[in-house]
Amino acid sequence: MKRVVLTGTGSGVGKTTIATGIMKALSDEHKIQPFKVGPDYIDPSYHNCATGVSSRNLDSFFMSDGQIRQSFKNGMTSSHADYGIIEGVRGLYEGISPTNDIGSTSSIAKALNSPVILIINSRSLVRSAAAMTLGFKALDSRIDIEGVILNNVKSQKHYLKTKEAVEKLANTRVLGGIERDNSISMEQRHLGLIPAVEQERISGLVEKWGELIRENIDLDALMEIMDNSNPIINEYEPIWSPNKTKHKTRIAVPFDEAFNFYYKENLEALEYNNAKIEYFSPIHDEQLPSVDALYIGGGYPEIFKKELSKNTTMLESIKEFSQDNHPIYAECGGLMYLCKTIDSLPMVDVFPYHSMLTKRVQGLSYTIAHVQRDNPILKKNTTYHGHEFHYSKVEYTGSNSNDFAFSMRRGVGITGKYDGLLKNNTLASYIHTHTACLPDFGYNFTQSAYENK
């Protein structure tokens, strides 16, 4: 399977612009399967726009090496891709530890035995770009850095000087350089880039990135690197449990401006377990569709709180669904939506607490949670991994730890100690999870949906 990892020396070097531009440029003549390293919903939305193919996340905190390879294989096979292009996260070696590579781009490159392209912010650099390249190559001999892309060069003259330095002093070929251009930058929000689903101009912007890549990057050289990818180790592990619910169920999944943070494989795990996904909009539709369960992902409900609050028939239908004991699982933005209010505006009110946006980040971490109560997705006395990233908080005014399904071993959750409000058969948590670290997610949730029809 032909592939490449596009990584950077750090955050803010232009990985998403360059990776998405490469995906767009190559998609004109080839089938591209995009991937993103780490727990990220926003960058993949740009990949989807560029390729017309759902991007998948690869993460060594969530996944074993065998699961990383399986997820990569699943993506390449399902899309019949010619090339797999993997956008890294932060710097090549950044993970959860200063001394190992768990959660890093380098761990993904090694699990997939993939060639790597290093993106360098070349502003005011010439020979130092060569030094950076040498350092990144020297830190781990198992990382195969096959090329460099120079971003933010001042001029053609600057590019040629820096290219010569990297190729002669670091013995690494330079595939091209991108000059500084503020017109190609993306709008930011508190969780990062604005999701592509919201931006009407995104298709034009992605097209511009593709043109920029066609004009400045040696795509033939890049494809040659991918064509010569070394074999992937033939050791795979399943992403979800082979146990399968025999009964057919229908599961509602909101997907609109407010809610659009979902991992592709979570939805596939539900479908594997005979669930039919019914997509709907809490903003635009009048009520919940006729279903057996509800899965509310994250997103930006705080940005669309007025629209959500005005849709009273939808709010009432979801509250009644919870009161009727049908299973609901909600993550982050879904948790806020199920609270009494968001920034004082009425919401579903399954949980009698107020949620609000804050100026400072409240939770930004991989998480480890211990399950203290049975719930629609997990059984008591198990432990699972996830992640949280939120500039919001829920003002929990209760005093009973039994209100929560999870006690936190790593991360903040709702109270700093607990997460996962549980009422009726409704679970709402700040933790986002991936089926790779929760292999029974699809089975448990669909089984609960069937048992509580």
From Swiss-Prot:
UniProt pathway: Cofactor biosynthesis; adenosylcobalamin biosynthesis; cob(II)yrinate a,c-diamide from sirohydrochlorin (anaerobic route): step 10/10
Reactions it catalyzes: cob(II)yrinate + 2 L-glutamine + 2 ATP + 2 H2O = cob(II)yrinate a,c diamide + 2 L-glutamate + 2 ADP + 2 phosphate + 2 H(+); Ni-sirohydrochlorin + 2 L-glutamine + 2 ATP + 2 H2O = Ni-sirohydrochlorin a,c-diamide + 2 L-glutamate + 2 ADP + 2 phosphate + 2 H(+)
Keywords for the protein's UniProt record, in alphabetical order: ATP-binding, Cobalamin biosynthesis, Glutamine amidotransferase, Ligase, Magnesium, Methanogenesis, Nucleotide-binding
UniProt entry tagged with the keyword Electron transport: no
Enzyme class: ligase
InterPro entries, per the entry: CbiA/CobB_synth, Class_I_gatase-like, CobQ/CobB/MinD/ParA_Nub-bd_dom, GATase_3, P-loop_NTPase
A single GO molecular function term of this UniProt record: cobyrinic acid a,c-diamide synthase activity
CDD domains in UniProt: CobB_N (cd05388), GATase1_CobB (cd03130)
Active site: 332
Cofactor(s) listed in the protein's UniProt record: Mg(2+)
PANTHER family reported for this sequence: COBYRINATE A,C-DIAMIDE SYNTHASE
Notes concerning its domains: Comprises of two domains. The C-terminal domain contains the binding site for glutamine and catalyzes the hydrolysis of this substrate to glutamate and ammonia. The N-terminal domain is anticipated to bind ATP, and cobyrinate or Ni-sirohydrochlorin, and catalyzes the ultimate synthesis of the diamide product. The ammonia produced via the glutaminase domain is probably translocated to the adjacent domain via a molecular tunnel, where it reacts with an activated intermediate.
Protein name (Swiss-Prot/TrEMBL): Cobyrinate a,c-diamide synthase
Species classification: Archaea, Methanobacteriati, Methanobacteriota, Methanomada group, Methanobacteria
